[in-house]
């Protein structure tokens, strides 16, 4: 991804991402240690990247590679806003959400194969309908609640990381409100 996109380096915004990232990293180390998980510290090789894109997004890969798009910076508005988004994304990594999502997706795919084989054998005439029903049910019943639970957990851990790093968590609410307004086109 990074080799295919323009990574911003040396600018004041790139330096802010790095500086705030280091504060959140230190906060995450304190958080893991306080929760008896200091053995996980070596699992993360934190890296902070700013990519030149108008897209309003940020994400963290398992292992700690964080990507912020320049388009999210106006929504973040200030360092506390960046810390809110950074804390949330780091929380996904700490809670191992990426790996869990991949595992859940694999389970969903295996289930789809089983459903396809069963439909082919027992109801070949309705195989397409059976697969559509399976897809909808597994998404609504399995993947969406899973995603909502992950987002809630990342919100809680992210607020904690933000506070440990010295930022007022109330700023997170303001960022999420601005983010919501952006997505609604306001």
Residue ranges and their predicted role:
Residues 1-110, 118-122, 164-165, 182-185:
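Peri-catalytic and regulatory segments of divalent metal-dependent proteins
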Residues 23, 93, 156-160, 174:
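Charged/polar positions on well-ordered alpha helices
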Residues 54, 129-132, 178:
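Short hydrophobic/aromatic-rich motifs at helix boundaries and adjacent loops
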Residues 86, 137, 158, 176-180:
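A general structural motif at alpha-helix termini
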Residues 122-171:
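Metalloprotease/metallohydrolase-associated module, dominated by Zn2+-dependent proteases
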Residues 168-186:
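Long, well-structured alpha-helical subdomains associated
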């Amino acid at each position: 991804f990074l080799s295919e996109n323009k990574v911003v380096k040396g600018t004041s915004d790139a330096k802010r991402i790095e500086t705030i990232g280091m504060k959140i990293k230190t906060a995450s180390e304190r958080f893991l240690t306080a929760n008896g998980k200091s053995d996980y510290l070596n699992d993360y090789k934190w890296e902070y990247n700013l990519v030149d894109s108008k897209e309003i997004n940020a994400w963290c890969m398992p292992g700690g590679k964080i990507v912020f798009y320049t388009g999210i910076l106006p929504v973040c508005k200030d360092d506390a806003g960046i810390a809110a988004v950074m804390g949330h994304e780091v929380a996904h990594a700490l809670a191992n959400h990426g790996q869990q999502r991949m595992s859940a997706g694999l389970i969903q795919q295996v289930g789809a194969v089983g459903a396809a084989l069963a439909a082919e054998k027992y109801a070949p005439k309705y195989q397409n309908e059976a697969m559509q029903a399976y897809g909808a049910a597994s998404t609504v019943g399995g993947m969406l609640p899973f995603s909502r639970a992950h987002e809630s957990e990342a919100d809680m851990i992210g607020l904690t990381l933000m506070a440990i790093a010295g930022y007022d968590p109330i700023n997170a609410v303001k960022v999420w409100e601005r983010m919501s307004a952006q997505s609604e086109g306001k």
